[in-house]
Regions:
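Cysteine-centric redox/oxidoreductase cores and disulfide-bonded domains
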Residues: 129-237
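Extracytoplasmic thiol/disulfide redox context detector
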Residues: 2-133, 184-201, 206, 228, ...
Length: 237
């Protein structure tokens, strides 16, 4: 009986000590001078540098969620043949890009790798020519090729040929079997205008911009980040 009572008393003492410690810690935090609390936050962020970027990403996703919801169909419906991957996709990844953008070019192998590895993925390519006249010509010709079902030939050839210029654009146009000079086409101009409007609503400040599910990712985020975002969409069902 005494042993049980002693054990109970010891348990109560330990529990009381833990509760007391927690209360003391809480009081210290709430009573802590501002400069100390700021220092602790700073130390925590230095120890975990991803916290800030993850927080910014989460806030941005919340900010643009209504825009994505109201423009989902427009974003994920390709112009002509400006897409690759699954005909009936499980997940759609949208990329806004410029053929003259080095970060877009650097991202291209990651995008191609995702397509090879994921049979349920579709990539929708949206032209956003922001880097000069040659970018605009390349974008118009890509859309012209897209209308004829030859987007892939133009797209892949131009990436391999190099930065958009009259010579490289001509090589890509020849591969797609289209004239090297863009023709006036209201549908193409409307597509470019729509892309700029959508990108503006999503706060795009450059290229590339990737959209998958409710995520908006700016810049050359890399293979792992894109793969994780795609997996997150699947996990949500």
């Amino acid at each position: 009986m005494n042993e049980k009572r002693g054990s109970s008393l010891m348990t109560a003492a330990i529990a009381g000590g833990l509760i007391g410690s927690l209360l003391t810690a809480a009081l210290l935090i709430f009573a802590m001078p501002e400069y100390l609390s700021s220092r602790i936050v700073r130390q925590g962020m230095l120890a975990n540098p991803n916290i800030l970027s993850e927080t910014v990403d989460a806030l941005r996703d919340q900010q643009y969620a209504p825009v994505l919801a109201s423009n989902r169909r427009a974003l994920e419906t390709p112009f002509g043949s400006s897409w690759k991957g699954a005909e009936k996709p499980e997940v759609t990844l949208v990329e806004f890009y410029d053929y003259a953008c080095p970060y877009c070019k650097a991202s291209n192998p990651s995008v191609d790798r995702l397509l090879r590895e994921d049979p349920g993925l579709r990539i929708v390519y949206r032209e956003l020519p922001i880097l000069g006249p040659d970018s605009v010509v390349a974008a118009r010709l890509a859309l012209q090729a897209s209308k004829q079902g030859r987007f892939g030939q133009f797209h892949d050839t131009l990436w391999k040929a190099g930065r958009p210029a009259p010579q490289t654009i001509a090589v890509a146009a020849q591969a797609a079997g289209i004239p090297a000079q863009p023709v006036k086409d209201p549908a193409i101009e409307a597509e470019l205008k729509s892309n700029f409007q959508l990108a503006g609503q999503l706060g795009a400040t450059g290229t590339p911009v990737f959209i998958v599910g409710d995520r908006v990712m700016n810049g050359a985020v890399g293979y792992e980040a894109l793969k994780k975002a795609i997996a997150d969409v699947r996990a949500k069902g």
